[in-house]
Regions:
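N-terminal alpha-helical membrane-insertion module
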Residues: 10, 18, 37-38
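A subset of signal/propeptide-processing and intrinsically disordered low-complexity segments
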Residues: 9, 13, 191-192
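Sec-dependent signal peptide hydrophobic core
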Residues: 16-20, 24
Length: 208
């Protein structure tokens, strides 16, 4: 038996296998370089401050959170994303707290609205809350509202305010604060309103 011939054959097969592995690796490397992974959240800077409003989870009333800066940029349900201010969701009481499964419709009672401020640029802000309507439960008044101002990084609770809204169309001032150079926040005494000062109808609807 010519054992050298078999050794030569096995060596040739090993060489072909190694070449195949090498070409496969080079192909995968070239594919990765041609299609680089997109930078995460390159289009959406992280939040620096959060304004969080919550009210009775079982309430059917529609309460709205509004913010206005010193450049007259107004963010609320009509204009949800403007000047690095973003309202995450227009909570309508229990009317949009539902989701559908294969079996039925589930209700998750959470009444909460959050506005993100995605910049530490020096600006001054006014925050208000507005009783839009109580169509879901005409007798459900008054409404106890809690509003928090949080700094995200480093995490700090800057202010917590509780107000009571008694009837639809009522608006209450929550706080007036200013972001200074470097990110420090100071508060001002004020009773400025947004909706009742500007007129809700004058704020145009803007798609996100």
């Amino acid at each position: 038996m010519d054992t050298n011939r078999y050794k030569s054959t096995f060596g040739f097969v090993d060489l072909l296998f190694n070449l195949l592995v090498g070409f496969t690796f080079l192909f995968m490397l070239a594919f990765i370089l041609i299609n680089p992974v997109a930078k995460k959240e390159a289009h959406d800077p992280k939040a620096e401050y959060l304004v969080i409003m919550s009210w009775d989870d079982n309430s059917k009333s529609d309460i709205d959170l509004w913010i206005k800066d010193d450049k007259d940029n107004i963010v609320g349900f009509r204009s949800k994303d403007l000047a690095l201010l973003t309202l995450d969701r227009d909570d309508l009481g229990d009317r949009n707290d539902m989701y559908t499964t294969k079996e039925n419709v589930e209700l998750v009672p959470v009444n909460r609205e959050v506005i993100s401020i995605r910049s530490k640029t020096p600006r001054r802000y006014v925050v208000t809350t507005h009783f839009y309507n109580n169509l879901g439960d005409p007798d459900a008044t008054p409404q106890n509202i809690k509003i928090e101002l949080l700094q995200v990084n480093p995490y700090r609770i800057l202010k917590i305010v509780e107000v009571v809204l008694v009837e639809p169309s009522q608006e209450k001032h929550v706080f007036d604060f200013q972001v200074l150079t470097g990110g420090e926040v100071i508060f001002h005494e004020s009773d400025q309103l947004i909706i009742n000062d500007v007129a809700l109808e004058s704020i145009p609807y803007m798609d996100r």
